Amino acid sequence: MQKTDFMDTNYGMEIVRATEIAALTAARLQGLGNHAGILNDSREAITKTLNRLAIEGGVINDRFAGRPEIFQLPATLGRGGQRMDLMAVPLEAYHSAADGRNNAASFAVIAREGAIQSVPNLSMYKLVVGPEAGEVIDINQPPIVNVKRVARALGKYTENVTVLILNQTRHRQLINEVRSCGARIKLIEEGEISGCMAAITGERADIYMGYGFAPEGALVAAAISCLGGYFEGKIFYENDRDRAQAMEHGIDDFDKIFRVEDLVRSREIAIAATGVTDGEFLEGVRFTANGAITSSFIARGETRTCRRLETRHFFDYKPVF
């Protein structure tokens, strides 16, 4: 297959259709308490939509791969064509979506084949800031130091810096340390990708910090390669099995600090996202009398172009699912 220029096709517009369908599917089950159903249905929906693309997309970094109770994304998506890397999170914060809480969204990334580093499904501590803060953060420094560095870079008082953290028991010490320097804290129950996007764009937060998943870290790195910003992440290994899992992904430095260039090796990349419930980054799906309205985001690495989309879907004319 002859390679084509990544610029020849607006892949962001192609994959945003998939995140829209996944979000619409999930929104139909919002608040009904069906946790497995909302996750599986959204995964099936994004699979069907991505399979329409004229690509051969290898799926990378699916956190639910190999779990028999979860609908499995195929190893390859698309109807044939240019070989690509694909990452898909059909429904982030699916527990929140099922319970009717905020910050659920759908994400997809497409890139030139070989551009995205595969990572093990392990815990990763992350620090994320937008481009205005620059490369001032250091994951090896205490949280207070990083908060003060970001405040200085942004020209803000420390008390005016907003730090976004997942509201989890293992973050108690982190939360207390950030509070001790007077910075504002915003806690979210789920949705670390949306939280990181809020910090990258600087719209509702200045810093994201805390533990999450390594596959989500790769997707955040993809977003930064499209938008600018800075990311540091460190995978945590509890035992030899974890280290063996990392080696299967070509990772043999177990103290490595991952940065964007370690996880994304090409600017030929695009990201799309659609909100399911109102969140830190995107508005959720709003149903109307004859359809729905979705809020989405697209960005492209080569041009740093980013778009906000409000799409009106009319189910009476041609239902999309």
Q: Model features per residue range: what roles?
A:
Residues 109, 113-187, 292-297, 302-318:
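Acidic beta-strand-loop-alpha-helix segment within the catalytic core
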